[in-house]
């Protein structure tokens, strides 16, 4: 048995152990022995002791400064770190648990389980590093397939791609997070797939609400959640999306499952990158963003894809600062997306939810080659009616509806019915409205909007189309309205 006194003592001469030479907020400079400088992205560990409390923190190497000094970003607050303190090189990048063990669990960026206090210790059998290469070109799936959501406005006008990247754009308070929660519910119910949720720089309260709602809906056990919230250091917020994506990749590549990856909010990912870039001393680019914004975004987005027969479909909430779509953060994200769902403050103010703007939302598969001629023709007609109505609004505001031609009056009337019919009861809104959510099959959606555009329902009052599922609901509502009016 080795005596304690003869054991090696950690010092500057021991490989894999360095000493802190500088602490500037979340940025820590560490000097290592010349022959054992760890590579960029390696995880380092050290312990902060304040009084009787000890906390282990993880740091990730971001730069080699020269003179045997590396610069690392701390993933927890650095209060209590001192110069000369020892830091251990783990010899590998940050890694997270993968596999079925992740379902029904809440993790932080380094893969620690957050919702197992007082429970039995959970054995982690496999971990993957969060920095991984995207699939090779010859491994990618070449077929394009529609991802049906059961939400009318999305399926008809901005159809999602199986294995694609979808952006939910909108300012504060227009319903991005609620729509993401709705999609988690629908995927669990209708697709039976696995969901992975990345909470990137959002409010802790929202994360808590999401977990409680998922437990109530019975979908929590099919979802892995990874959180790096608003109050955490920028290094955590920058890496948490990669931690969640790594868990999703395991289900796709090893379990051969289709996965839905939710990221809320991708703007906070960009914002964290900007903070880290500034802390590392890089010269800022346009509007103060990091000079490697496009590169950082590409590293994340290129890993979200379909391989042969299996897919990761990503739904990303994207906050638009001051509703400015030319801001570099949302503008850089646009290039990677297969579909964009823009949430409109004006539509939300009229009480029409989901508040999707049908004229500015887009999808690359809104094409007869992918959807069929009937779907494409119906979507095109609906958009044409809504666009014509938008053009006529200025005339109506000045002269009134009575000054329009008979043809234009019919167009405006049908457009109003279409606008009302694009609203829909959602499962997540039941607690506010008291009305059960509805799922509308794509075939019904196409037929319904085609009939409204043809004028088959011109005799039905506009209010009968509000917040309903299909035309059967409209007819039922219309009968009730007629009875009430005698």
UniProtKB/Swiss-Prot annotation:
EC number(s) per entry: 7.1.2.2
Keywords, ordered alphabetically: ATP synthesis, ATP-binding, Cell membrane, CF(1), Hydrogen ion transport, Ion transport, Membrane, Nucleotide-binding, Translocase, Transport
SUPFAM superfamilies reported in the protein's UniProt record: C-terminal domain of alpha and beta subunits of F1 ATP synthase (SSF47917), N-terminal domain of alpha and beta subunits of F1 ATP synthase (SSF50615), P-loop containing nucleoside triphosphate hydrolases (SSF52540)
Domain of life of the organism encoding this protein: Bacteria
Residues holding ATP: 170-177
Catalytic activity entry: ATP + H2O + 4 H(+)(in) = ADP + phosphate + 5 H(+)(out)
Record-level GO cellular component terms: plasma membrane; proton-transporting ATP synthase complex
Record's subunit section: F-type ATPases have 2 components, CF(1) - the catalytic core - and CF(0) - the membrane proton channel. CF(1) has five subunits: alpha(3), beta(3), gamma(1), delta(1), epsilon(1). CF(0) has three main subunits: a(1), b(2) and c(9-12). The alpha and beta chains form an alternating ring which encloses part of the gamma chain. CF(1) is attached to CF(0) by a central stalk formed by the gamma and epsilon chains, while a peripheral stalk is formed by the delta and b chains.
Name of the protein this chain belongs to: ATP synthase subunit beta
Organism whose genome encodes this protein: Clavibacter sepedonicus (Clavibacter michiganensis subsp. sepedonicus)
Gene: atpD
């Amino acid at each position: 048995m080795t005596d304690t006194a003869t054991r090696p003592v950690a010092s500057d001469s021991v490989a894999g152990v360095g000493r802190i030479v500088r602490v500037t907020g979340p940025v820590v400079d560490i000097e290592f022995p010349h022959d054992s400088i760890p590579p960029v992205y390696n995880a380092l560990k050290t312990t902060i002791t304040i009084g009787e409390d000890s906390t282990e923190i993880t740091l990730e190497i971001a730069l080699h400064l020269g003179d045997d000094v590396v610069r690392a970003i701390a993933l927890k607050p650095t209060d209590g770190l001192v110069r000369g303190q020892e830091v251990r090189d783990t010899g590998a990048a940050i890694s997270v648990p993968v596999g079925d063990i992740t379902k029904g669990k809440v993790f932080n960026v380094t893969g620690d389980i957050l919702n197992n206090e007082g429970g039995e210790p959970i054995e982690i059998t496999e971990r993957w590093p969060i920095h991984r290469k995207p699939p090779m070109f010859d491994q990618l799936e070449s077929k394009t397939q529609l991802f049906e959501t059961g939400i009318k406005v999305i399926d008809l006008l901005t159809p999602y791609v199986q294995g694609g990247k979808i952006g939910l754009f909108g300012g504060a308070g227009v319903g991005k997070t609620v729509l993401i929660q709705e999609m988690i519910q629908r995927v669990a119910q209708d697709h039976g797939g696995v969901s992975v949720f990345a909470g990137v720089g959002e409010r802790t309260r929202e994360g808590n609400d999401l977990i409680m709602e998922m437990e109530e809906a019975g979908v929590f056990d099919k979802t892995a959640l990874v959180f790096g919230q608003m109050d955490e250091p920028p290094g955590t917020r920058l890496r948490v999306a990669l931690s969640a994506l790594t868990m999703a990749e395991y289900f796709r590549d090893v379990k051969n499952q289709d996965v839905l990856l939710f990221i809320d909010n991708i703007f906070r990912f960009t914002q964290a990158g900007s903070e880290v870039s500034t802390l590392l001393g890089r010269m800022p680019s346009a509007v103060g963003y990091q000079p490697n914004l496009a590169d950082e975004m590409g590293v994340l987005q290129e890993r979200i894809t379909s391989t042969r027969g299996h897919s990761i479909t990503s739904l990303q909430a994207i906050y638009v600062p001051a509703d400015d779509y030319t801001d570099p953060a949302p503008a850089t994200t646009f290039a990677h997306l297969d579909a964009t769902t823009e949430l409109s403050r004006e539509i939300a103010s009229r009480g029409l939810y989901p508040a999707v703007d049908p004229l500015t939302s887009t999808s690359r598969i809104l094409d007869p080659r992918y959807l069929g001629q009937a779907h494409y023709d119906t979507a095109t007609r609906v958009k044409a009616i809504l666009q014509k109505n938008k053009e006529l609004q200025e005339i109506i505001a000045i002269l009134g509806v009575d000054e329009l031609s008979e043809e234009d009056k019919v167009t405006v009337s049908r457009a109003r019915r279409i606008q009302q019919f694009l609203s829909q009861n959602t499962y997540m809104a039941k607690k506010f409205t008291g009305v059960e959510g509805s799922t509308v099959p794509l075939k019904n959606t196409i037929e319904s909007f085609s009939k409204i555009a043809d004028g088959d329902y011109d005799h039905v009052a506009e209010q009968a189309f509000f917040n309903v599922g299909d035309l059967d609901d409209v007819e039922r509502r219309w009968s009730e309205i007629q009875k009430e009016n005698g």
